[in-house]
């Protein structure tokens, strides 16, 4: 059984708190439906890289706008986290767009296309054998 490192526990707690704070406390109308997909904390707990996704948004301009809003609010978010989590030092927050979801969707669609092509070829081969 693997023991969780402190950085993993802090990352999980940050992810939960940030998800709530972003949804409930940031009132900027430019902010879309943001999901905190993962958080990675440096070994010294100095930095936290927060990876976000946007529901239904693939436009680069909208993604950049949402990242700007979050980066502008990072001081507020850090202060709120300091009130909610007992840490000697709250990590510096760095926001990034998580492209893994988009890549996963793209790969899934490519696999679906390949399977459909394979089925069509298989059906064509079966028809040729019947003739």
From Swiss-Prot:
Does the record carry Cytoplasm as a key word? yes
Q: Which InterPro entries does this UniProt record tie to the protein?
A: KH_dom-like_a/b, RbfA, RbfA_dom_sf, Ribosome-bd_factorA_CS
Q: Name one GO cellular component term.
A: cytosol
Q: Name one GO molecular function term.
A: ribosomal small subunit binding
Q: Which GO terms describe its biological process?
A: maturation of SSU-rRNA
| UniProt key word Cytoplasm | yes
Pfam families noted in UniProt: RBFA (PF02033)
SUPFAM superfamilies cross-referenced by the UniProt entry: Ribosome-binding factor A, RbfA
Q: Which PROSITE patterns match?
A: RBFA (PS01319)
Signal peptide: which range, if any?
Answer: none
Locations listed in the record: Cytoplasm
Tell me which UniProt keywords the record has, alphabetically: Cytoplasm, Ribosome biogenesis
Which family does the similarity line name?
Belongs to the RbfA family.
UniProt subunit comment: Monomer. Binds 30S ribosomal subunits, but not 50S ribosomal subunits or 70S ribosomes.
Q: What is this protein called?
A: Ribosome-binding factor A
Originating organism: Chromohalobacter salexigens (strain ATCC BAA-138 / DSM 3043 / CIP 106854 / NCIMB 13768 / 1H11)
**Lineage of the source organism?**
Bacteria, Pseudomonadati, Pseudomonadota, Gammaproteobacteria, Oceanospirillales
Gene for this protein?
rbfA
